[in-house]
C-alpha cells in the first residue's frame, strides 16, 4: 500500500451541509466520516482538510475568513474527533471545480478503510520552477 496525501473537502464530505437555521457548530458529521477518516489516518495516510467556508461572504479575504470561522471549525473537528494533519481555509468559492486528480465523493462506504481503492495521482511533481 502506498501512503497517500489525501485532500478532503469539509462541507458535504466530512460534515453535513449547513442549513439556513443552523450554524457551523450545529452540523453533524456525515455518516461514516469519522470512522473512515480514522481508518485512513491509522493506515498512515496524510489527511488534509480543505474548506471554502465563508469565502463567498468574505469576498475571498482569507484573513477575515479565519477571524469568522477558524475557531468554530477547529472546535467542531475536535468535538467529533476528526483526524487530520493539515487544514486549509481559503478554498476559492466556485459553482463547480474541475480537477484532474479529483475523486467524486458519494458516500464513505465506497472508500476502503486503508484507501486502496482511491485513485492514484497521475501527476509528477517537479521541485523548483
What is the role of each PLM region?
Residues 1-129:
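Catalytic phosphate/metal-binding cores of nucleic-acid and nucleotide-processing enzymes, i.e., regions
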Amino acid at each position: 500500500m502506498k501512503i497517500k496525501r489525501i485532500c478532503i473537502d469539509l462541507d458535504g464530505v466530512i460534515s453535513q451541509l449547513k442549513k439556513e437555521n443552523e450554524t457551523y457548530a450545529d452540523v453533524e458529521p456525515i455518516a461514516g466520516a469519522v470512522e473512515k477518516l480514522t481508518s485512513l489516518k491509522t493506515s498512515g495516510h496524510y489527511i488534509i482538510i480543505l474548506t471554502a467556508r465563508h469565502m463567498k461572504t468574505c469576498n475571498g479575504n482569507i484573513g477575515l475568513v479565519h477571524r469568522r470561522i477558524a475557531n468554530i471549525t477547529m472546535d467542531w473537528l475536535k468535538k467529533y474527533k476528526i483526524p487530520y494533519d493539515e487544514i486549509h481555509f481559503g478554498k476559492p468559492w466556485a459553482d463547480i471545480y474541475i480537477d484532474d486528480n479529483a475523486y467524486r465523493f458519494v458516500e464513505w462506504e465506497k472508500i476502503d478503510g486503508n484507501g486502496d481503492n482511491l485513485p492514484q495521482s497521475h501527476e509528477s511533481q517537479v521541485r523548483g520552477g
